[in-house]
Amino acid sequence: MTELETAMGMIIDVFSRYSGSEGSTQTLTKGELKVLMEKELPGFLQSGKDKDAVDKLLKDLDANGDAQVDFSEFIVFVAAITSACHKYFEKAGLK
């Protein structure tokens, strides 16, 4: 597999690993999203002191209003974070 194919598979695996423990295997609940972020993106929540960060994130990601994050909504989040990191590293001259 190519590097990009491997990366895509890893994103799918991460979503699957955290979805389904509280509800459907096709979506992340608020609790599942929080655990995913704590384990996979610890710096994202750690830097903020806002206790409602996961609630706000869920509201922003939940395009269809079902109080859960499906894979399409999750991948938009991953793409946005990746884009922000890319811009940061370009500005820092680390690319």
Curated annotation (Swiss-Prot):
Gene3D superfamilies: EF-hand (1.10.238.10). Residues 12-47, 49-84 form the EF-hand domain. SMART domains: EFh (SM00054), S_100 (SM01394). It holds the Pfam family S_100. It is found in: Nucleus; Cytoplasm; Cell projection, Microvillus membrane. It comes from the Eukaryota. The keyword Repeat applies. Keywords: Calcium, Cell membrane, Cell projection, Cytoplasm, Membrane, Metal-binding, Nucleus, Repeat. Ca(2+) 2 binds at residues 62, 64, 66, 68, 73. The keyword Cell membrane applies. GO terms for biological process: endothelial cell migration. Ca(2+) 1 binds at residues 25, 27, 32. This protein binds two calcium ions. PANTHER family: PROTEIN S100-P, S100 CALCIUM-BINDING PROTEIN. This is Protein S100-P.
